[in-house]
Design a protein with these regions (language model features):
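Single conserved hydrophobic/aromatic residue that forms the stacking wall/gate
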Residues: 307-314
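Glycine-rich dinucleotide-binding loop and its adjacent helix/turn
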Residues: 21-75, 80, 105-109, 158-160, ...
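Mid-to-C-terminal Rossmann-like scaffold of FAD/NAD(P)H-dependent oxidoreductases
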Residues: 91-93, 104, 115-116, 148-151, ...
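A Rossmann-like FAD-binding core segment of flavoenzymes
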Residues: 1, 73-174, 237, 244, ...
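Conserved redox-cofactor binding core of oxidoreductases
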Residues: 1-18
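FAD-site-proximal beta/loop scaffold in flavoenzymes
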Residues: 34-51, 137-210
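Glycine/Thr-rich phosphate-binding loops of Rossmann-like dinucleotide-binding domains
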Residues: 27-29, 65, 70, 151-154, ...
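Short hydrophobic core segments
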Residues: 13-22, 140-147
Length: 314
């Protein structure tokens, strides 16, 4: 492999290689990216002062996580999302406790609305809205969080014979091996879900495969977590996926309003649910909404992985 460095170029030989080049924030076109008041998620972590008002474009996990942070720090937060619901990909009932809570705390949440353009003014950025919410509003800062794009097409992987899709992803098998037998890929560059803990496990699988171990990766047992307030987490098959595949499934729910600890913490808005296959009674998925859902979902991952029967859980 050839490496271009500041001082010189260097060639490195290897028996096996792992590509872990990640992804970058997706930038909307026709936006004034030269203005530092327009940010991506990386910029939002480097602010030296808290903005009085913040517009978050994108109601996905990253956008909502940053919205929760800055709302807690005192910003008047507005979220705009193009689709009919927040956090696409999660089951709507899991998102509902979060949406009810932030609706009381944020300045506004605009669904089925898009930002058509952003004008630069001396004292603010002016966002123009189209859709269910029309008009224009001023904000001290605007965060664009509409997704991420993989970096697979930025490293000349094709020169080594590695397949890269038109979207920049690098396809792999369940050992994280690319179409070139001694080159592996992990993390955001191999596809969804784009989660750090997924990438860590993929790295373990790839390293074991390099060492000749019989290791394999199954994305279905990797939990997805939104570190919002309340947190939202799920693992395995979602209800939307079960419906789409025509699976005959059942749902068991436990409302946290019936939990003494939740009552003591005055956080009863959450719930836990399990999905099971009605034919086999085996658990195929789980979801949790509420404080510390990201920790609690770890209890559900082995249940989903081992396909315990519904009556075997308590």
């Amino acid at each position: 492999i050839g490496v271009e460095r500041r001082e010189d170029n260097k060639r490195i030989t290897f028996e096996n290689a792992i590509i872990a080049v990640g992804s970058q924030s997706l930038e909307l076109s026709n936006m004034p990216w030269g203005d530092p008041r327009l940010m991506d998620s990386t910029d939002a972590l480097e602010l030296e002062e808290i903005p009085g008002s913040l517009l978050v474009i994108g109601g996905g996990i990253i956008g909502l996580e940053m919205a929760c942070v800055y709302s807690a720090l005192g910003s008047a937060v507005t979220v705009v999302e193009l689709t009919p619901g927040l956090m696409p990909g999660a089951d709507p009932d899991l998102v509902r406790p979060l949406q009810r809570r932030i609706a009381k705390r944020y300045a506004a949440i605009h669904l089925e609305t898009k930002v058509t353009r952003i004008d630069v003014a001396d004292d603010a950025l002016v966002a123009h809205f189209e859709g269910k919410h029309e008009g224009q509003e001023k904000f001290e800062r605007i965060l664009v969080a509409v997704g991420r794009t993989p970096n697979g097409d930025r490293i000349h992987a094709k020169a080594a014979g590695v397949e890269v899709t038109s979207r920049g992803f690098i396809p792999t098998d369940n050992q994280m091996r690319t179409n070139v037998p001694n080159i592996f890929a992990i993390g955001d560059v191999v596809g969804q879900p784009m989660l750090a803990h997924k990438a860590t496990h993929e790295g373990k699988v790839a390293a074991e495969a390099c060492a000749g171990e019989k290791s394999a990766f199954d994305a279905r047992v990797i939990p997805s977590v939104a570190y919002t307030d309340p947190e939202v987490a799920w693992v395995g098959v979602t209800e939307a996926e079960a419906k789409e595949s025509g699976l005959d499934y059942g749902v068991g729910k436990f409302p946290w309003a019936a939990s003494g600890r939740a009552l003591g913490n005055d956080r009863t808005e959450g719930f836990t649910k399990l999905l099971f296959d009605k034919k086999t009674n085996r658990i195929i998925g789980a979801g949790i909404a509420g404080p510390h859902a990201g920790d609690l979902i770890a209890e559900c991952a082995p249940v989903s992985y081992t396909h315990l029967r519904a009556h075997e859980t308590t």
